[in-house]
């Protein structure tokens, strides 16, 4: 098994996010691509990572390979990499994985392939009243601003707008409006007005994923799970599901 990706930044952002979810993860590397599913310890959120083989500079996988890793340790390795450096992941045995970071200086890491069981995740079929592609930069800024005043964000949709609103102590409030007119929404599908509260801390934990794409695909309904999708240029996506914060 040998795969090469020509810009390690995307993997850094993904693994950095995983450290907020899990201690150990499992990349299932198949002939068509790489997949990982993780559920946070409180079972409030779920992340599904799909990296298609077309995304990679080289992709040589004859038989399925399961790569179990400690998320904090892998994140430390990737943190060494510089911008746009190449990363290769390869193995000729089920016990060891070789990671090479290529730049002005090649750095080689041999790590143990640990035993990790994939989580049991029930099949979820959700229907959404609202779907919209929001500017990732604006979404990240908004979540950071709201998290400074409260731990709950209300997501509201009315016709051609999506509003993110937070109310803090002593009447403090922040409200950011996304619309096509301002360029903060690229496209939107609207069936009915919707409003739902979510834990802003869980959204803060995944903000590194906004670096994967210019737009974040948001989908939700009133008091139903929120779905965020980050589509990577070249072939891959990360999907995040978050349960509503209901009293």
From Swiss-Prot:
- SUPFAM superfamilies in the cross-refs: DNA clamp (SSF55979)
UniProt-listed CDD domains: PCNA
What are the BP-aspect GO terms?
leading strand elongation; regulation of DNA replication
Gene Ontology MF, one: DNA binding
Keyword presence, Translocase: no
Keyword DNA-binding attributed: yes
Organism superkingdom: Archaea
Stored Pfam families: PCNA_C (PF02747), PCNA_N (PF00705)
Instruction: Name the keywords, alphabetized.
Output: DNA replication, DNA-binding
Where is the secretion signal located? none
Query: Which PROSITE patterns does the annotation name?
Result: PCNA_1
Q: How does it assemble?
A: Homotrimer. The subunits circularize to form a toroid; DNA passes through its center. Replication factor C (RFC) is required to load the toroid on the DNA.
Write out the similarity annotation. Belongs to the PCNA family.
What does this protein do, in the record's words? Sliding clamp subunit that acts as a moving platform for DNA processing. Responsible for tethering the catalytic subunit of DNA polymerase and other proteins to DNA during high-speed replication.
**Protein's name according to its UniProt entry:** DNA polymerase sliding clamp 1
The record's gene field reads pcn1
């Amino acid at each position: 098994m040998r795969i090469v990706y020509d810009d390690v930044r995307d993997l850094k952002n993904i693994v950095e996010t995983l450290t907020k979810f899990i201690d150990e993860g499992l990349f299932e590397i198949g002939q068509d691509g790489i997949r990982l599913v993780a559920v946070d310890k409180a079972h409030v959120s779920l992340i599904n990572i799909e990296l298609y083989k077309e995304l990679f500079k080289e992709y040589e996988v004859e038989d399925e390979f399961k790569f179990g890793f400690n998320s904090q340790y892998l994140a430390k390795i990737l943190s060494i990499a510089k911008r746009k450096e190449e990363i290769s992941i390869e193995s000729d045995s089920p016990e060891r994985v070789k990671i090479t970071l290529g730049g002005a200086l090649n750095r080689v890491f041999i790590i143990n392939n640990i035993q990790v069981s994939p989580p049991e995740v029930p099949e979820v079929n959700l229907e959404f009243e609202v779907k919209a592609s929001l500017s990732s930069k604006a979404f990240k800024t908004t979540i950071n601003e709201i998290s400074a005043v409260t731990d709950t964000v209300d997501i509201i949709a009315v016709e051609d707008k999506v509003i993110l609103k937070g109310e803090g102590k002593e009447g403090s409030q922040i409200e950011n409006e996304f619309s096509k007119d301002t360029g903060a929404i690229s496209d939107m599908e609207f069936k009915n007005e919707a409003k739902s509260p979510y834990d802003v801390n869980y959204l803060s934990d995944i903000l590194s994923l906004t670096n994967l794409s210019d737009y974040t695909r948001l989908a939700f309904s009133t008091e139903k799970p929120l779905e965020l999708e980050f589509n990577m240029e070249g072939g891959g996506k990360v999907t995040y599901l978050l349960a509503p914060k209901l009293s």
